[in-house]
Design a protein with these regions (language model features):
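Membrane-embedded alpha-helical bundles that constitute the cytochrome b-like, heme-associated redox core
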Residues: 2-206
Length: 206
């Protein structure tokens, strides 16, 4: 019985496809697991958030231009991390899943808290950009990266500045609520919630 002729791809096309697959495998092999990456992101963002809650540009100005540039550079790092976190969420959704011991109301709160934190971080980055956009002078993060072309909108700049400040305080409240929720889970439900994001070195204390 005659067989249908096999459809063979050209050698060049096969080589390109194989190379792409190998390159993709190599790249993904060297990328950290998503949970590991988020854990690193989590503990990188937290100290920066605390820093910007406690220290304002006016606090560092008396220490000279170098101190101000360092403060500004930390802001650039913070914004970059916020945008990476938001991009990961938009691409792949929430990485965190509610544990099986959570009641229905806690499952809903779990999702709401995590989503609000991500959009809160994005909001801080956005209003930071608006501050640069409405400024009368060109602002550069860390003296390196321009914020945006300055439009010199004094009134809008004042509004953006106020929103930016209140966003930080609101974000701090969300962080406290987030931490309190997971501490409650860990102690009351005994579901080891704190071990999810805590470094392994601390697991024996939790």
């Amino acid at each position: 019985m005659p067989h249908a002729p096999a459809i063979n791809l050209p050698d060049t096309q096969l080589c390109k496809s194989t190379r792409r697959q190998r390159l993709k495998a190599v790249l993904f092999a060297h990328l950290p697991h998503r949970r590991s990456a988020l854990k690193a992101l989590h503990w990188s963002v937290l100290p920066l958030l605390i820093w910007f809650l406690l220290v304002t540009p006016s606090d560092v100005l008396p220490f000279g231009p170098t101190a101000f540039q360092i403060h500004s550079l930390l802001g650039l790092v913070f914004v970059t991390l916020c945008l990476l976190w938001t991009a990961g969420y938009l691409r792949r959704g929430l990485a965190s899943r509610p544990g099986p011991k959570l009641p229905l109301w806690a499952r809903r709160l779990h999702r709401w808290l995590h989503t609000a934190l991500i959009w809160g971080l994005f909001g801080v980055a956005l209003t930071g950009f608006l501050l640069g956009l409405t400024s009368a002078t060109l602002l550069k993060a860390g003296g390196i990266l321009p914020f945006a072309p300055p439009l010199g909108l004094h009134g809008a700049n004042q509004i953006a500045g106020q929103i930016h400040i209140y966003e930080f305080y609101l974000l701090a409240l969300l962080v406290v609520a987030h931490a309190g929720f997971h501490i409650w889970r860990h102690l009351r439900l005994r579901d080891n919630a704190l071990r999810i994001m805590a470094p392994k070195a601390l697991h024996r204390f939790l």
